[in-house]
Amino acid sequence: MSRARDAGCVAAGIVIGASAWYCVYKYTRGKDQKKKRLTKPKNRASVGTGSRARAGLRAGFTIDLGPGFSPPNPVDIEIMNKAQGEASNLATTVAEEVAPAAPSPKVQNGAESKVQELNGAKTEANLESVVMPSATCTVTPPPKVAGGLTAAEAPEIIGAPKVLEAPSTTEASGAVAAPGPTVSPMIAQTPGPVVPSPTIVSTGPAAIPWAVAHPGAVQSPGPAVPPMAVQSLVPAAPSWAVVAPPGAVYIPVAAHFAGPAAASRVTQSPGTVIPPLPPPSSVLPRGVPSVPGRTVQSPGAAVHPVAAQSTGVVVPPRAVQYSGAAVTSGGAAVPSGGAATPRAAASTQRTASTEVMQVPRVAAATEATETPRIGTPAMVAEASLPVHSGAAENPGTSGSSKTAATGKKAAPGAHTGAIPKAGSATGAVPKGGGGKGGNKNRSGGKGKNRKNKVDVDELGMGFRPGDGAAAAAAASANGGQAFLAEIPESEEGESGWTDTESDSDSEPDVPQRGKGKRTIPMHKRPFPYEIDEILGVRDLRKVLALLQKSDDPFIQQVALLTLSNNANYSCNQETIRKLGGLPIIANMINKTDPHIKEKALMAMNNLSENYENQGRLQVYMNKVMDDIMASNLNSAVQVVGLKFLTNMTITNDYQHLLVNSIANFFRLLSQGGGKIKVEILKILSNFAENPDMLKKLLGTQVPSSFSSLYNSYVESEILINALTLFEIIFDNLRAEVFNYREFNKGSLFYLCTTSGVCVKKIRALANHHDLLVKVKVIKLVNKF
C-alpha cells in the first residue's frame, strides 16, 4: 500500500509539473504560429508503399457509454497530419543515429534533446496530437490490413520505411476482460508468463500509431509490480517514432516476428522521442509463430491478470460502434448496422464485460500474420474495413483488398429494404373483396369465383338460376306481387356486383385463411330493391351485357332495376346511351312478364329525362301506349308507362306521335285511379301548350264525367292538375279566335268556355280547404 501511495504521489507530481511546463511552453511558442484554415476531412483511406495513409474523421459523432465515460474531444486533423509528417521525417533522421537495440534512458533523453533542437517549434503539433484529455490509451493499426495490432514483433529489423499516418479516431478491437485490482498509473507490468493479449479499448476520439498510457490509466497487476514505470522492449522498436506527452510511459507493441525479446528495459521521461527502426516487408515470414503483446488499457477498465483472449473475441452485445460494424478478428467484415450476437464463438478464459466502441476505416499492419480462429457468426452487421482483435492472425492471410468477409444471413426485407410480396401480412385487399366482410362475394364464399350452397350463375351475378319461375309462382300466390331474395349490397367498390374478372392482371388473388364458407341469409321482401351505389362505365357495361345474355327473369328484373336506379343521374344517362344500352333496355318491354315490362319502363322513364336520349326513345312511344291500354287498369305498367310518356311530351318535338291516342287518354282519365288521372292530366297539359296539338285536343270528344274532376271532394293533387289544364286551355282560347262551328257539342272546347260547366264548378271551389287549390281558383276566377 505504501508503494502504491508513493507511486501515486510521484505520478501526481509529474502530471502537475508536466501540465505547468506544457502550458508555459504552449503560451510562449504558440504566438509565432499562424492559424490555418481547416480542410474538410476526407472519409477515405489511401494506402501505398512509401505514401502516408490518410483517413477522415467523422466529426460530431458521439456515443453515450454510460455515466463513467465522457464524450470524445474533437481532433484537429490538420495538426495531426502535420505532426505525423514531421514525426516521419524525424524518425528517418534520428534512426540513423540510434542503435537497433532498445536505447537506455540517457540515449532517449539525448534523442529527445536532439529532436527538440531540430524541431523546437514543431514539437507542439506532436504534443497536441498525442495528448488527448479523454483518450488514455489509443492504438490504431495501419490501414486496410487485418493484422493483429498487439502481435509480437520480430527482433530483427532492417531498414526504416516511412511512417504511416494514424487515423483520427480509435477503434476498439474487441471486448475487455472483467475488471480486476487496479495499479498505480505509472506502473507497467513486468514480463511474466506470456499470455494472449486481450483487446485494446479506447474511449478517445483520436488515435496515433503508437501506444501511450495516460497517467490516469489503470491496469491490472502482473506477476510482479516494480516500483518504477518500466516496460520491456524488443531489440527493435516499432516502425514509427513516438513523441510521448509529459508523464506518459512508452509501451511499444510487440514485433510481428518470432524470436526472444530483448531483456533491456527503458524508463522514459516526459516528452521522450523514440526513433525505432521498422522491419522491412521482405524479412517478414508468413508462417512464423507470433509472440503475444501486452495489454494496453483505457482509464476505468481493469483487466484480470489471467484473462487471455484469442483473435476470435466477439464484441459483447452491448458494444457500441462508431461505424455500426462488428468485424471478426481474422479480417472478416460483418454487415453494417447490426449488433454482434452474444453466442459467437470465442476462445477466452474470461468473459468481456466492458462496453467498447468502434471507429470506421482503421488501418492495419501491412504484413500481419494470423492464426486460425473462429469468425463472428453471420448475424452481425458488415463493416467497411477489417478490425483487429488484439492477437496474431492466420498465417498467410493479410489485410489487403482480398480480405474475405463472413457471409451474412439476413431476413428478407430486414436490412436490404426489399418489399415483401403482397400477401395477407401486407394488408393488400384484392379486388374481389371488401373491408368489412373480408373477401366475400354475393355467393357467400371467400374471394372471387367461390361458391357455397347459394349457386352462382355462369355470368357471376350471384343469382340463382331458375328463380324467375319461382318468383312468378310466388307472385300469383301473392296477388301479383313478386317476392325476390334480398341481395346484400356489395363492398367491392363501384360495381355493386360480384366481379367475375380481375380488374387488373397485376393484382394477385390473396385467399383469406381461417374463414369458412358462410351462407348469406335470404331475407325476402317485394320489389323494388334499391341500390344506392352509382355504377361506373365498366360496371354498367357488365350489367347491360348480363341483361342481354341472360334469359332468367329474376336476373333480368334485378339488372333492369339496377339500370333504372343508376339512370337517375345525368352522368349515367349519357353513359348508358354511349354504351348502346337504350335499345337493350327498350327491347325488354316486349317481354310478356309484367314485372320485366315494368322495370324496363322505369329505366326508360329515367333515361328519357335526357334530351338526346329522347331522340333514341321516341320510336318506342306508340308501343308503350299500346302496352298501357292493354295492361290491367291501374297496374304498375300503366302508371310507369304514362310517366315515360309525360317526359317524352315535355317538348313539342315528339307530341305529334301521340295525336291519335288523345281519346284513349280521356278514357283512362275517367276510369283510372288517382295516379292514372294525375299522369294523364300532365300529358294533356303538355298537349295544350303546343298550338299544333291544341286544336286536336279541343275537338276531342270527352266523357261527361270529365267535369267531375272539379268537384270539391276530389283529391287536391288531381284537382290542382285539372285546374292547370283548364287555365292553359282558357288562356289559349282568349289569345286566339276559334270558330265555334268547327267543334262539336260534347267536345272539350264547349266544356272550357265561359258558359261551360267547368267554369261554374271552378267558381264553387273558392272556399276549398286546400290553400293551393284556393289560390289557384282565385287566380282563374279573376280571368273569367
UniProtKB/Swiss-Prot annotation:
Q: Where is this region: Disordered?
A: 328-353, 388-461, 488-522
Q: What are the ranges of the ARM repeats?
A: 528-568, 570-609, 650-689
Note one Pfam family from the annotation. Answer: Arm_2
Coiled coil regions, renumbered to chain = none
All ranges on the Mitochondrial intermembrane side of the membrane: 1-6
Predominant subcellular localization, coarse grouping: mitochondrion
Stated membrane topology is: Single-pass membrane protein
Localization (cell): Mitochondrion; Mitochondrion outer membrane
The UniProt function text for this chain reads: May regulate the dynamics and distribution of mitochondria in neural cells.
Q: PANTHER family, per this entry?
A: ARMADILLO REPEAT CONTAINING PROTEIN, ARMADILLO REPEAT-CONTAINING X-LINKED PROTEIN 2
Q: What is the official name of this protein in its record?
A: Armadillo repeat-containing X-linked protein 2
